[in-house]
């Protein structure tokens, strides 16, 4: 009998679909990258999704984030994502956390309950804490490196953190992983050189902040706000979603 996952089953088979339906994945960061990862996982039939993000949809998110529309501005991203997931498949179990993941909040999560962890957050301290906790729990993790200030979505690669180049965030993560004797870390990164944003005081977030009321981490406190677009972060998020699905089912690509 056909269902909404019939076309995916044609590629993966029934056993793999059952594996996906029985899997639980945590996505940390529901923004330009993580939002599209969630979309891919939900449409692929992952049975349980944990969404972690304390941010609200801002008008400036409309250029790239799948959770952002005029109607959702001011709403929590995890709430918007949960509704979207249930519009896709009401049977997916969704757990939301309005939490900014840091070393101080990390103990609120039991990483042994996840089949896979996705890091799509944008602070080094949070990213490395997330990696350490996942590694300690023996839970597979994939991390997004920098997707801002870039224009070419074809430059993304999936590799180990120690094989990365060009990306400034990856360079910092390599150093932090070495300090903690982390031997391997799967990442998605871009080999495209980082662009320098075209500064314009008339659209400066620091001078004209429009973060929704109640936003905990306003752009006024950020050292810099990277340029972004609709077609680079989204591709990174979809690549990550694909890697998670393939890893969960043990997909072996055809040679040739």
Where are these predicted regions, by residue range?
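N-terminal charged helix/coil linker that caps or initiates catalytic domains
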Residues: 1-26
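Conserved SAM/SAH-binding loop
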Residues: 98-106
């Amino acid at each position: 009998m056909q269902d909404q996952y019939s076309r995916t089953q044609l590629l993966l088979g029934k056993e793999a679909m059952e594996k996906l339906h029985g899997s639980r994945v945590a996505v940390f960061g529901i923004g330009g990258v993580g939002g599209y990862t969630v979309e891919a996982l939900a449409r692929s039939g992952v049975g349980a999704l944990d969404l972690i993000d304390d941010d609200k949809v801002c008008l400036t998110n409309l250029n790239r984030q799948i959770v952002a529309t005029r109607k959702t501005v001011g709403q929590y991203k995890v709430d918007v994502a949960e509704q979207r997931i249930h519009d896709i498949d009401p049977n997916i179990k969704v757990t939301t956390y309005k939490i900014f993941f840091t070393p101080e909040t990390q103990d609120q999560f039991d990483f042994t309950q996840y089949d896979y962890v996705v890091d799509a957050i944008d602070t080094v301290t949070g990213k490395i804490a997330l990696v350490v906790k996942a590694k300690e729990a023996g839970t597979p993790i994939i991390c997004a490196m920098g997707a801002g200030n870039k224009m070419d979505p074809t430059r993304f690669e999936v590799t180990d953190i120690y094989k990365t180049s060009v990306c400034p965030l990856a360079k910092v993560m390599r150093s932090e992983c070495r300090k903690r004797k982390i031997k391997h870390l799967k990442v998605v990164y871009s080999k495209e050189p980082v662009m320098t944003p075209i500064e314009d005081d008339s659209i400066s977030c620091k001078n004209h902040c429009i973060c929704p009321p109640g936003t905990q981490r306003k752009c006024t406190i950020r050292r810099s706000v990277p340029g972004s677009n609709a077609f680079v972060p989204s591709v990174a998020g979809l690549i990550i979603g694909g890697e998670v699905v393939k890893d969960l089912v043990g997909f072996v690509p055809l040679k040739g």
